[in-house]
């Protein structure tokens, strides 16, 4: 054997050993149960309204657009007939009127530094869009029509380098069907809010087979599933208080943490301005603890509701509580219609860096995820658990020294996996069956 040939084979063997070692390095040296106490701080950054395919469909190695195209998810109208072209996108003349009936790149028409129209993301509509797993009515049951089939260039996203460096979950689902309000409440309580005597005008009407006749915020049996605002202050000026949700009394993860002496806070952009009655970008339906009696004005629990500026200060000073929920405000949260993807993600990157570069970064886990899919297509059929969901697949990124590096985690997770993690880490009782049974990111984390 020539020296050149010998060196070639030696290099191949070295590469194989190195790759094998890298794979082994992805396994914890200690168990999840023994290692999880190493995490002293959890930071959940809760962005808005994008499906996995919409943002990370082009992520190499993930279950994305290549598989979606193989599935040939032709969109059909409400009668089940295929569209010749995607239905015309309203409220924005940048999109052509004859888009082919398939997935398309949004960036070629509206760059990611500009907001697109909002896309329909409601409780009953999400189920109609999924269409019993056919995934073929996202355009039909959508006010923005064909826009539902759009996606962004993944590598151009500000969060892409972070997703590539750490763990990207490509099998993570929003816990509840539909929109932001419902999934925010579910994130902290693993249950649906109740309003048995809601105004009739707010109640949805379904036929005997469960088909939607008239949409509404409240189910016929009294659960609040679409956007409502809390009767607890602050609420928007000139609100009709008869149409504001009465304070809820079921337990939340905040209650569990406070009972156990675990420090925590929910930080919202614009909170201080909203409380003071000043002009603000605070989103009233994105403040889930505000829906509960335990957090109304004058309560002890209210002290845990803070402004995003307080989070930034605490992150830089190293005074973060054990558990932080961080909620960017309108214009900065990626919500279509009011926020653009690119600058919103730039803001999220700054929040992440504030944590990782601060004194608490060495023992922190950051989870960046989205409340829901925003009405955008995703090709993966959600698992069936109960009447509430899960809904569509959404992105989730685990970041920090305990997240596996350069890893795609295809383990089934959902929004309340975050609750499950908190409960496992700090020894808390589950709130409901859903969080009790959810995987607490066991396969995404690594401990030494």
Predicted regions and their residues:
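Sec-dependent N-terminal signal peptides
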Residues: 6-14
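N-terminal pro-sequences and low-complexity stem/linker regions of secreted or lumenal proteins
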Residues: 22-448
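Positively charged n-region of N-terminal signal peptides that target proteins for export
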Residues: 1-5
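C-terminal motif of bacterial Sec signal peptides marking the signal peptidase cleavage site
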Residues: 17-18
């Amino acid at each position: 054997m020539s020296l050149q040939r010998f060196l070639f084979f030696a290099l191949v063997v070295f590469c194989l050993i190195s790759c094998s070692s890298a794979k082994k390095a992805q396994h914890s040296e200690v168990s999840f149960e023994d290692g999880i106490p190493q995490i002293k701080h959890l930071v959940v950054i809760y962005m808005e309204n994008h499906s996995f395919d919409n943002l990370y469909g082009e992520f190499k190695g993930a279950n994305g657009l290549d598989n979606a195209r193989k599935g040939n998810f032709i969109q059909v109208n409400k009668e089940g007939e295929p569209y010749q072209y995607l239905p015309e996108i309203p409220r924005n003349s940048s999109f052509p009127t004859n888009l082919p009936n398939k997935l398309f790149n949004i960036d070629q028409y509206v760059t990611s530094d500009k907001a697109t129209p909002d896309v329909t993301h409601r409780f009953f509509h999400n189920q109609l869009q999924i269409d019993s797993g056919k995934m073929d009515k996202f355009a039909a049951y959508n006010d923005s029509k064909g826009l539902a089939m759009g996606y962004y260039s993944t590598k151009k996203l500000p969060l892409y380098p972070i997703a590539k460096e750490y763990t990207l979950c490509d099998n993570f689902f929003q816990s509840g069907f539909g929109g932001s309000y419902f999934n925010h409440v579910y994130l902290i309580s693993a249950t649906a809010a109740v309003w048995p005597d809601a105004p009739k005008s707010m109640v949805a009407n379904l036929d005997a087979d469960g088909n939607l006749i008239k949409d509404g915020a409240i189910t016929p049996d009294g659960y609040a599933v679409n956007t409502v605002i809390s009767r607890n202050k602050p609420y928007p000026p000139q609100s009709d208080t008869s149409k504001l949700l009465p304070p809820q009394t079921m337990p939340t993860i905040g209650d569990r943490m406070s009972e156990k002496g675990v420090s925590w806070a929910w930080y919202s952009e614009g909170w201080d301005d909203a409380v003071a009655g000043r002009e603000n970008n605070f989103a009233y339906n994105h403040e889930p603890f505000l829906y509960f009696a335990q957090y109304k004005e004058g309560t002890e629990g209210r002290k845990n509701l803070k402004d995003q500026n307080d989070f930034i200060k605490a992150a830089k000073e190293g005074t973060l509580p054990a558990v932080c929920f961080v909620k960017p405000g309108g214009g900065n949260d990626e919500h279509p219609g009011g926020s653009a993807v690119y600058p919103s993600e730039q803001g999220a990157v700054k929040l992440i860096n504030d944590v990782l570069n601060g004194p608490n970064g060495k023992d922190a886990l950051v989870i960046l995820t989205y409340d829901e899919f925003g009405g955008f297509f995703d090709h993966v059929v959600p698992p069936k658990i109960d009447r509430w969901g899960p809904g569509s697949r959404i992105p989730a990124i685990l970041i920090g020294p305990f997240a596996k590096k350069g890893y795609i985690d295809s383990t089934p997770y959902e929004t309340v996996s975050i609750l499950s993690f908190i409960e496992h880490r700090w020894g808390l009782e589950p709130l409901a069956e859903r969080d009790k049974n959810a995987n607490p990111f066991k396969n995404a984390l690594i401990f030494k």
